[in-house]
Swiss-Prot record:
EC identifiers of the protein: 4.2.1.2
GO cellular component: cytoplasm
Gene it is expressed from: fumC
Species lineage: Bacteria, Bacillati, Bacillota, Bacilli, Bacillales
Annotated organism of origin: Oceanobacillus iheyensis (strain DSM 14371 / CIP 107618 / JCM 11309 / KCTC 3954 / HTE831)
Catalytic activity: (S)-malate = fumarate + H2O
Subunit structure: Homotetramer.
Residues annotated as catalytic: H186, S316
Pathway, per record: Carbohydrate metabolism; tricarboxylic acid cycle; (S)-malate from fumarate: step 1/1
Protein's recorded name: Fumarate hydratase class II
Amino acid sequence: MDYRVEKDTIGEIQVPADKYWGAQTQRSKQNFPIGNEKMPVEIIKAFAILKRSTAEANFELGLMERDKMEAIQYAADQVLNDSLTDHFPLVVWQTGSGTQSNMNVNEVLAFVGNKWLQEQGSDLKLHPNDDVNKSQSSNDTYPTAMHIAAVLKLEDTVLPALSQLKNTFAEKQSAFENIVKIGRTHLQDATPLTLGQEISGWHRMLEKSETMISESLEHLRELAIGGTAVGTGLNAHPDFSEKVCKAISTFTNKKFISAKNKFHSLTSHDETVYAHGALKGLAADLMKIANDVRWLASGPRCGIGEITIPANEPGSSIMPGKVNPTQSEAVTMVVTQVMGNDAAIGFAASQGNFELNVFKPVIAYNFLQSSQLLADSIISFDERCAVGIEPNHEQIEKNLNDSLMLVTALNPHIGYENAAKIAKKAFADNSTLKETAVELGLLTEEQFDEYVNPEEMTYPK
Protein backbone atom coordinates (compact mmCIF):
# COMPACT_ATOMS: atom_id res chain seq x y z
CA MET A 1 0.00 0.00 0.00
CA ASP A 2 1.21 3.50 -0.84
CA TYR A 3 1.28 6.14 1.87
CA ARG A 4 1.69 9.86 2.20
CA VAL A 5 2.98 11.63 5.29
CA GLU A 6 0.64 13.94 7.21
CA LYS A 7 1.43 15.81 10.39
CA ASP A 8 -0.34 17.38 13.34
CA THR A 9 0.77 18.80 16.68
CA ILE A 10 1.87 15.34 17.80
CA GLY A 11 4.11 14.80 14.80
CA GLU A 12 4.20 12.95 11.49
CA ILE A 13 2.11 9.90 10.62
CA GLN A 14 1.55 7.78 7.52
CA VAL A 15 -1.88 7.94 5.85
CA PRO A 16 -2.99 5.66 2.98
CA ALA A 17 -2.33 7.58 -0.22
CA ASP A 18 -5.82 6.95 -1.61
CA LYS A 19 -7.63 8.29 1.47
CA TYR A 20 -8.61 11.91 1.97
CA TRP A 21 -8.38 12.06 5.75
CA GLY A 22 -5.45 13.51 7.64
CA ALA A 23 -3.28 12.92 10.67
CA GLN A 24 -5.90 13.19 13.41
CA THR A 25 -8.25 10.75 11.70
CA GLN A 26 -5.41 8.30 11.19
CA ARG A 27 -4.42 8.51 14.85
CA SER A 28 -7.99 7.83 15.92
CA LYS A 29 -8.21 4.88 13.55
CA GLN A 30 -5.08 3.40 15.10
CA ASN A 31 -5.82 4.30 18.71
CA PHE A 32 -9.41 3.02 18.87
CA PRO A 33 -9.63 -0.45 17.26
CA ILE A 34 -12.88 -1.04 19.15
CA GLY A 35 -15.91 -2.78 17.68
CA ASN A 36 -17.46 -2.45 14.24
CA GLU A 37 -19.93 0.34 14.97
CA LYS A 38 -18.97 3.15 12.59
CA MET A 39 -19.91 6.75 13.22
CA PRO A 40 -23.45 6.94 11.76
CA VAL A 41 -23.62 8.30 8.23
CA GLU A 42 -26.40 10.58 9.45
CA ILE A 43 -23.90 12.31 11.74
CA ILE A 44 -21.34 12.66 8.95
CA LYS A 45 -23.95 14.20 6.66
CA ALA A 46 -25.16 16.48 9.44
CA PHE A 47 -21.57 17.65 9.83
CA ALA A 48 -21.44 18.35 6.10
CA ILE A 49 -24.58 20.48 6.36
CA LEU A 50 -23.08 22.27 9.34
CA LYS A 51 -19.69 22.92 7.70
CA ARG A 52 -21.19 24.35 4.52
CA SER A 53 -23.34 26.60 6.74
CA THR A 54 -20.47 27.75 8.95
CA ALA A 55 -18.47 28.60 5.83
CA GLU A 56 -21.38 30.70 4.59
CA ALA A 57 -21.68 32.48 7.94
CA ASN A 58 -17.95 33.17 8.11
CA PHE A 59 -18.03 34.58 4.59
CA GLU A 60 -21.02 36.83 5.37
CA LEU A 61 -19.21 38.11 8.45
CA GLY A 62 -16.14 38.98 6.40
CA LEU A 63 -14.06 36.26 8.02
CA MET A 64 -13.54 34.02 4.98
CA GLU A 65 -12.82 34.48 1.28
CA ARG A 66 -15.56 33.53 -1.17
CA ASP A 67 -13.36 30.93 -2.88
CA LYS A 68 -12.74 29.16 0.42
CA MET A 69 -16.45 29.16 1.23
CA GLU A 70 -17.29 27.71 -2.16
CA ALA A 71 -14.55 25.09 -1.83
CA ILE A 72 -15.89 23.95 1.55
CA GLN A 73 -19.44 23.88 0.24
CA TYR A 74 -18.39 21.91 -2.84
CA ALA A 75 -16.66 19.33 -0.65
CA ALA A 76 -19.60 19.17 1.75
CA ASP A 77 -21.96 18.51 -1.14
CA GLN A 78 -19.78 15.58 -2.19
CA VAL A 79 -20.32 14.11 1.27
CA LEU A 80 -24.06 14.66 1.01
CA ASN A 81 -24.32 12.86 -2.34
CA ASP A 82 -22.43 9.83 -0.94
CA SER A 83 -19.32 10.31 -3.07
CA LEU A 84 -16.92 10.24 -0.10
CA THR A 85 -18.31 7.45 2.09
CA ASP A 86 -15.02 5.51 2.18
CA HIS A 87 -13.20 8.42 3.77
CA PHE A 88 -15.03 8.33 7.11
CA PRO A 89 -13.64 5.21 8.83
CA LEU A 90 -13.94 6.07 12.51
CA VAL A 91 -15.91 4.10 15.06
CA VAL A 92 -18.32 5.33 17.71
CA TRP A 93 -15.96 4.26 20.49
CA GLN A 94 -13.58 7.22 20.46
CA THR A 95 -13.32 10.48 22.36
CA GLY A 96 -16.62 11.25 24.06
CA SER A 97 -16.78 14.74 22.57
CA GLY A 98 -16.67 13.38 19.03
CA THR A 99 -13.58 15.50 18.35
CA GLN A 100 -11.98 12.94 16.07
CA SER A 101 -15.05 12.66 13.86
CA ASN A 102 -15.27 16.45 13.69
CA MET A 103 -11.64 16.48 12.58
CA ASN A 104 -12.29 13.61 10.15
CA VAL A 105 -14.87 15.82 8.46
CA ASN A 106 -12.59 18.87 8.62
CA GLU A 107 -9.69 16.97 7.07
CA VAL A 108 -11.71 15.39 4.28
CA LEU A 109 -13.45 18.64 3.37
CA ALA A 110 -10.10 20.46 3.35
CA PHE A 111 -8.54 17.78 1.12
CA VAL A 112 -11.41 17.76 -1.38
CA GLY A 113 -11.81 21.53 -1.19
CA ASN A 114 -8.13 22.06 -1.96
CA LYS A 115 -8.39 19.85 -5.03
CA TRP A 116 -11.31 22.00 -6.15
CA LEU A 117 -9.38 25.22 -5.51
CA GLN A 118 -6.47 23.91 -7.59
CA GLU A 119 -8.84 23.09 -10.43
CA GLN A 120 -10.17 26.66 -10.24
CA GLY A 121 -6.62 28.00 -10.51
CA SER A 122 -6.76 29.53 -7.02
CA ASP A 123 -3.68 30.03 -4.87
CA LEU A 124 -5.76 29.69 -1.69
CA LYS A 125 -5.42 26.61 0.49
CA LEU A 126 -7.86 25.28 3.08
CA HIS A 127 -6.66 24.27 6.53
CA PRO A 128 -8.80 21.75 8.48
CA ASN A 129 -8.72 23.80 11.69
CA ASP A 130 -8.21 27.37 10.56
CA ASP A 131 -10.78 27.30 7.75
CA VAL A 132 -13.17 24.34 7.84
CA ASN A 133 -13.39 24.51 11.65
CA LYS A 134 -13.23 28.32 11.79
CA SER A 135 -15.26 29.85 14.67
CA GLN A 136 -16.02 26.35 15.95
CA SER A 137 -15.05 23.72 18.48
CA SER A 138 -15.82 20.01 18.49
CA ASN A 139 -17.69 20.75 21.71
CA ASP A 140 -20.35 22.76 19.88
CA THR A 141 -20.21 21.16 16.43
CA TYR A 142 -20.83 17.57 17.53
CA PRO A 143 -23.98 18.32 19.56
CA THR A 144 -25.14 20.51 16.68
CA ALA A 145 -24.65 17.63 14.25
CA MET A 146 -26.50 15.35 16.68
CA HIS A 147 -29.55 17.61 16.64
CA ILE A 148 -29.50 18.13 12.88
CA ALA A 149 -29.30 14.37 12.32
CA ALA A 150 -32.06 13.68 14.85
CA VAL A 151 -34.47 16.21 13.36
CA LEU A 152 -33.87 14.94 9.82
CA LYS A 153 -34.29 11.33 10.89
CA LEU A 154 -37.48 11.90 12.85
CA GLU A 155 -39.13 14.17 10.29
CA ASP A 156 -38.08 12.34 7.13
CA THR A 157 -38.05 8.71 8.27
CA VAL A 158 -39.86 7.97 11.54
CA LEU A 159 -42.94 10.17 11.23
CA PRO A 160 -43.76 9.14 7.63
CA ALA A 161 -43.52 5.46 8.61
CA LEU A 162 -45.71 6.06 11.64
CA SER A 163 -48.29 7.87 9.51
CA GLN A 164 -48.37 4.96 7.05
CA LEU A 165 -49.27 2.39 9.72
CA LYS A 166 -51.68 4.79 11.38
CA ASN A 167 -53.57 5.18 8.09
CA THR A 168 -53.77 1.41 7.67
CA PHE A 169 -55.32 1.06 11.12
CA ALA A 170 -57.80 3.85 10.31
CA GLU A 171 -58.92 1.87 7.27
CA LYS A 172 -59.21 -1.37 9.26
CA GLN A 173 -61.08 0.42 12.04
CA SER A 174 -63.69 1.59 9.55
CA ALA A 175 -63.91 -1.73 7.71
CA PHE A 176 -64.42 -3.76 10.89
CA GLU A 177 -66.58 -1.32 12.89
CA ASN A 178 -69.64 -3.60 12.89
CA ILE A 179 -67.92 -6.90 13.68
CA VAL A 180 -68.83 -7.67 17.29
CA LYS A 181 -66.33 -9.78 19.22
CA ILE A 182 -65.58 -10.63 22.80
CA GLY A 183 -63.25 -8.32 24.70
CA ARG A 184 -60.51 -9.50 27.01
CA THR A 185 -59.01 -8.02 30.17
CA HIS A 186 -56.37 -9.72 32.35
CA LEU A 187 -56.20 -12.30 29.50
CA GLN A 188 -59.71 -13.35 30.53
CA ASP A 189 -63.05 -12.97 28.76
CA ALA A 190 -64.68 -9.56 29.19
CA THR A 191 -67.61 -7.65 27.69
CA PRO A 192 -68.02 -7.29 23.91
CA LEU A 193 -66.66 -4.63 21.61
CA THR A 194 -66.23 -4.43 17.88
CA LEU A 195 -63.05 -5.37 16.08
CA GLY A 196 -63.06 -1.83 14.74
CA GLN A 197 -63.17 -0.44 18.27
CA GLU A 198 -60.25 -2.64 19.28
CA ILE A 199 -58.18 -1.42 16.34
CA SER A 200 -59.20 2.17 17.07
CA GLY A 201 -57.19 1.84 20.27
CA TRP A 202 -54.13 0.92 18.23
CA HIS A 203 -54.77 3.87 15.92
CA ARG A 204 -55.01 6.27 18.85
CA MET A 205 -51.73 4.97 20.28
CA LEU A 206 -49.97 5.90 17.07
CA GLU A 207 -51.69 9.29 16.99
CA LYS A 208 -50.42 10.03 20.49
CA SER A 209 -46.91 8.85 19.65
CA GLU A 210 -46.94 11.04 16.57
CA THR A 211 -47.86 14.04 18.71
CA MET A 212 -45.21 13.32 21.33
CA ILE A 213 -42.46 12.85 18.76
CA SER A 214 -43.48 16.08 17.03
CA GLU A 215 -43.41 17.93 20.35
CA SER A 216 -39.92 16.61 21.12
CA LEU A 217 -38.69 17.89 17.76
CA GLU A 218 -39.15 21.47 18.91
CA HIS A 219 -36.43 21.02 21.53
CA LEU A 220 -34.05 19.35 19.08
CA ARG A 221 -34.25 22.37 16.79
CA GLU A 222 -32.07 24.33 19.25
CA LEU A 223 -28.43 24.14 18.14
CA ALA A 224 -25.27 24.47 20.22
CA ILE A 225 -23.20 26.05 17.45
CA GLY A 226 -21.59 29.29 18.59
CA GLY A 227 -20.81 28.04 22.07
CA THR A 228 -17.33 26.90 20.96
CA ALA A 229 -15.25 25.30 23.74
CA VAL A 230 -17.21 25.82 26.98
CA GLY A 231 -20.27 27.84 25.97
CA THR A 232 -18.84 31.36 26.09
CA GLY A 233 -18.47 31.66 22.31
CA LEU A 234 -14.74 32.35 22.45
CA ASN A 235 -13.26 32.87 18.94
CA ALA A 236 -16.72 33.12 17.33
CA HIS A 237 -18.37 36.31 16.08
CA PRO A 238 -21.41 37.35 18.19
CA ASP A 239 -23.66 36.93 15.11
CA PHE A 240 -22.09 33.65 14.01
CA SER A 241 -24.57 31.29 15.66
CA GLU A 242 -27.67 33.02 14.30
CA LYS A 243 -26.26 33.11 10.78
CA VAL A 244 -25.29 29.44 10.89
CA CYS A 245 -28.73 28.39 12.10
CA LYS A 246 -30.36 30.46 9.37
CA ALA A 247 -28.14 28.85 6.73
CA ILE A 248 -28.90 25.35 8.03
CA SER A 249 -32.63 26.10 8.04
CA THR A 250 -32.50 27.38 4.48
CA PHE A 251 -30.46 24.43 3.21
CA THR A 252 -32.56 21.73 4.90
CA ASN A 253 -35.89 23.54 4.61
CA LYS A 254 -36.40 22.79 8.29
CA LYS A 255 -36.52 25.10 11.27
CA PHE A 256 -33.39 25.39 13.42
CA ILE A 257 -32.59 28.07 15.98
CA SER A 258 -29.65 29.05 18.14
CA ALA A 259 -29.80 27.50 21.61
CA LYS A 260 -30.70 30.06 24.27
CA ASN A 261 -28.01 28.88 26.67
CA LYS A 262 -24.87 27.40 25.16
CA PHE A 263 -23.51 26.28 28.53
CA HIS A 264 -26.53 24.00 28.76
CA SER A 265 -26.30 22.76 25.18
CA LEU A 266 -22.70 21.58 25.56
CA THR A 267 -23.04 19.71 28.82
CA SER A 268 -26.66 18.48 28.72
CA HIS A 269 -28.49 16.22 26.31
CA ASP A 270 -31.90 16.35 27.94
CA GLU A 271 -33.51 17.20 24.58
CA THR A 272 -32.26 13.92 23.16
CA VAL A 273 -33.37 12.01 26.25
CA TYR A 274 -36.81 13.58 25.91
CA ALA A 275 -37.04 12.79 22.20
CA HIS A 276 -35.89 9.22 22.70
CA GLY A 277 -38.46 8.95 25.47
CA ALA A 278 -41.09 9.66 22.81
CA LEU A 279 -39.54 6.90 20.69
CA LYS A 280 -39.68 4.58 23.69
CA GLY A 281 -43.36 5.44 24.08
CA LEU A 282 -43.89 4.49 20.45
CA ALA A 283 -41.93 1.29 21.02
CA ALA A 284 -44.12 0.40 24.01
CA ASP A 285 -47.24 0.86 21.89
CA LEU A 286 -45.78 -1.23 19.09
CA MET A 287 -45.03 -4.05 21.54
CA LYS A 288 -48.66 -4.02 22.65
CA ILE A 289 -49.99 -3.91 19.08
CA ALA A 290 -47.66 -6.65 17.83
CA ASN A 291 -48.58 -8.88 20.76
CA ASP A 292 -52.31 -8.28 20.27
CA VAL A 293 -52.01 -9.17 16.60
CA ARG A 294 -50.15 -12.42 17.17
CA TRP A 295 -52.45 -13.49 20.01
CA LEU A 296 -55.60 -12.69 18.03
CA ALA A 297 -54.15 -14.60 15.06
CA SER A 298 -53.00 -17.56 17.17
CA GLY A 299 -54.03 -21.00 16.00
CA PRO A 300 -55.08 -21.78 13.39
CA ARG A 301 -57.27 -24.34 15.19
CA CYS A 302 -56.20 -24.32 18.82
CA GLY A 303 -55.71 -20.63 19.52
CA ILE A 304 -57.87 -17.52 19.64
CA GLY A 305 -57.91 -17.28 15.86
CA GLU A 306 -60.18 -14.25 15.56
CA ILE A 307 -58.09 -12.64 12.82
CA THR A 308 -55.92 -13.94 10.03
CA ILE A 309 -52.62 -12.42 8.92
CA PRO A 310 -50.62 -12.92 5.72
CA ALA A 311 -48.57 -16.10 5.38
CA ASN A 312 -45.26 -14.63 4.21
CA GLU A 313 -42.95 -17.62 4.58
CA PRO A 314 -42.81 -21.17 6.01
CA GLY A 315 -42.72 -20.98 9.79
CA SER A 316 -40.95 -24.15 10.83
CA SER A 317 -38.07 -26.32 9.68
CA ILE A 318 -39.70 -29.39 11.25
CA MET A 319 -43.48 -28.81 11.33
CA PRO A 320 -44.92 -28.79 7.79
CA GLY A 321 -47.52 -26.16 6.97
CA LYS A 322 -46.80 -24.01 10.01
CA VAL A 323 -47.01 -20.23 9.55
CA ASN A 324 -45.74 -17.90 12.26
CA PRO A 325 -46.46 -14.22 13.08
CA THR A 326 -42.93 -13.25 12.07
CA GLN A 327 -43.58 -9.56 11.46
CA SER A 328 -44.89 -9.21 15.01
CA GLU A 329 -41.83 -11.03 16.30
CA ALA A 330 -39.49 -8.71 14.40
CA VAL A 331 -41.26 -5.67 15.84
CA THR A 332 -41.00 -6.99 19.39
CA MET A 333 -37.26 -7.56 18.99
CA VAL A 334 -36.84 -4.02 17.69
CA VAL A 335 -38.76 -2.77 20.71
CA THR A 336 -36.40 -4.68 22.99
CA GLN A 337 -33.42 -2.99 21.35
CA VAL A 338 -35.02 0.44 21.62
CA MET A 339 -35.69 -0.09 25.33
CA GLY A 340 -32.02 -0.99 25.82
CA ASN A 341 -30.95 2.04 23.81
CA ASP A 342 -33.10 4.24 26.01
CA ALA A 343 -31.32 3.00 29.11
CA ALA A 344 -27.93 3.67 27.49
CA ILE A 345 -28.96 7.16 26.38
CA GLY A 346 -30.36 8.06 29.78
CA PHE A 347 -27.22 6.98 31.60
CA ALA A 348 -24.91 8.62 29.06
CA ALA A 349 -26.84 11.89 29.27
CA SER A 350 -26.44 11.91 33.05
CA GLN A 351 -22.66 12.07 32.72
CA GLY A 352 -22.17 15.72 31.85
CA ASN A 353 -19.27 16.80 34.05
CA PHE A 354 -18.75 20.53 34.44
CA GLU A 355 -18.90 22.17 30.99
CA LEU A 356 -19.09 19.12 28.73
CA ASN A 357 -20.80 15.78 28.37
CA VAL A 358 -18.33 13.30 26.90
CA PHE A 359 -20.74 10.50 25.97
CA LYS A 360 -21.97 12.19 22.82
CA PRO A 361 -21.16 9.53 20.18
CA VAL A 362 -22.92 6.72 22.04
CA ILE A 363 -25.98 8.91 22.56
CA ALA A 364 -26.09 9.77 18.86
CA TYR A 365 -25.49 6.18 17.75
CA ASN A 366 -28.25 4.72 19.90
CA PHE A 367 -30.75 7.46 19.06
CA LEU A 368 -30.26 7.05 15.33
CA GLN A 369 -30.32 3.26 15.56
CA SER A 370 -33.62 3.35 17.45
CA SER A 371 -35.09 5.75 14.91
CA GLN A 372 -34.09 3.66 11.91
CA LEU A 373 -35.12 0.35 13.45
CA LEU A 374 -38.52 1.71 14.45
CA ALA A 375 -39.16 3.20 11.02
CA ASP A 376 -38.04 0.08 9.15
CA SER A 377 -39.99 -2.30 11.37
CA ILE A 378 -43.14 -0.17 11.20
CA ILE A 379 -43.08 -0.14 7.40
CA SER A 380 -42.35 -3.86 7.22
CA PHE A 381 -45.11 -4.67 9.73
CA ASP A 382 -47.55 -2.47 7.85
CA GLU A 383 -46.83 -3.78 4.36
CA ARG A 384 -46.41 -7.46 5.27
CA CYS A 385 -48.90 -7.85 8.09
CA ALA A 386 -51.25 -5.01 9.04
CA VAL A 387 -52.68 -4.39 5.57
CA GLY A 388 -53.54 -8.09 5.34
CA ILE A 389 -55.38 -8.41 8.66
CA GLU A 390 -58.82 -9.94 8.10
CA PRO A 391 -61.51 -11.11 10.53
CA ASN A 392 -62.27 -14.80 11.04
CA HIS A 393 -66.04 -14.38 11.32
CA GLU A 394 -66.77 -17.97 12.33
CA GLN A 395 -64.28 -17.97 15.22
CA ILE A 396 -65.31 -14.50 16.35
CA GLU A 397 -68.96 -15.60 16.51
CA LYS A 398 -68.10 -18.81 18.35
CA ASN A 399 -66.01 -17.05 20.99
CA LEU A 400 -68.65 -14.37 21.44
CA ASN A 401 -71.44 -16.88 21.99
CA ASP A 402 -69.33 -18.98 24.35
CA SER A 403 -68.43 -16.06 26.60
CA LEU A 404 -69.90 -15.93 30.08
CA MET A 405 -69.16 -12.22 30.40
CA LEU A 406 -72.23 -11.31 28.36
CA VAL A 407 -73.93 -11.76 31.70
CA THR A 408 -72.66 -8.29 32.61
CA ALA A 409 -75.60 -6.82 30.67
CA LEU A 410 -77.94 -8.34 33.27
CA ASN A 411 -76.51 -6.36 36.21
CA PRO A 412 -79.00 -3.47 35.93
CA HIS A 413 -81.93 -5.89 35.71
CA ILE A 414 -81.26 -8.65 38.27
CA GLY A 415 -78.27 -7.31 40.21
CA TYR A 416 -74.59 -8.20 40.31
CA GLU A 417 -74.94 -11.20 42.67
CA ASN A 418 -77.70 -12.89 40.67
CA ALA A 419 -75.77 -12.30 37.44
CA ALA A 420 -72.71 -13.89 39.06
CA LYS A 421 -74.81 -16.94 40.05
CA ILE A 422 -75.82 -17.41 36.43
CA ALA A 423 -72.23 -17.16 35.18
CA LYS A 424 -70.82 -19.57 37.78
CA LYS A 425 -73.53 -22.19 37.29
CA ALA A 426 -73.33 -21.95 33.50
CA PHE A 427 -69.60 -22.52 33.69
CA ALA A 428 -69.94 -25.43 36.11
CA ASP A 429 -72.72 -27.09 34.10
CA ASN A 430 -71.24 -26.25 30.69
CA SER A 431 -74.57 -24.72 29.78
CA THR A 432 -75.52 -21.45 28.14
CA LEU A 433 -76.27 -18.28 30.06
CA LYS A 434 -79.85 -18.29 28.78
CA GLU A 435 -80.46 -21.87 29.84
CA THR A 436 -79.07 -21.20 33.30
CA ALA A 437 -80.97 -17.94 33.80
CA VAL A 438 -84.24 -19.67 32.98
CA GLU A 439 -83.39 -22.71 35.13
CA LEU A 440 -82.69 -20.46 38.13
CA GLY A 441 -85.98 -18.68 37.56
CA LEU A 442 -84.31 -15.30 37.30
CA LEU A 443 -85.41 -14.50 33.74
CA THR A 444 -87.61 -15.75 30.93
CA GLU A 445 -86.12 -16.54 27.56
CA GLU A 446 -87.74 -13.42 26.14
CA GLN A 447 -86.29 -11.23 28.88
CA PHE A 448 -82.83 -12.69 28.39
CA ASP A 449 -82.91 -12.04 24.65
CA GLU A 450 -84.05 -8.47 25.29
CA TYR A 451 -81.37 -7.68 27.86
CA VAL A 452 -78.41 -9.58 26.41
CA ASN A 453 -77.69 -8.09 22.99
CA PRO A 454 -73.96 -8.09 22.15
CA GLU A 455 -74.35 -5.46 19.43
CA GLU A 456 -76.06 -3.03 21.79
CA MET A 457 -73.43 -3.72 24.44
CA THR A 458 -70.73 -2.29 22.17
CA TYR A 459 -72.50 1.08 21.92
CA PRO A 460 -74.40 1.42 25.22
CA LYS A 461 -77.06 4.13 25.41
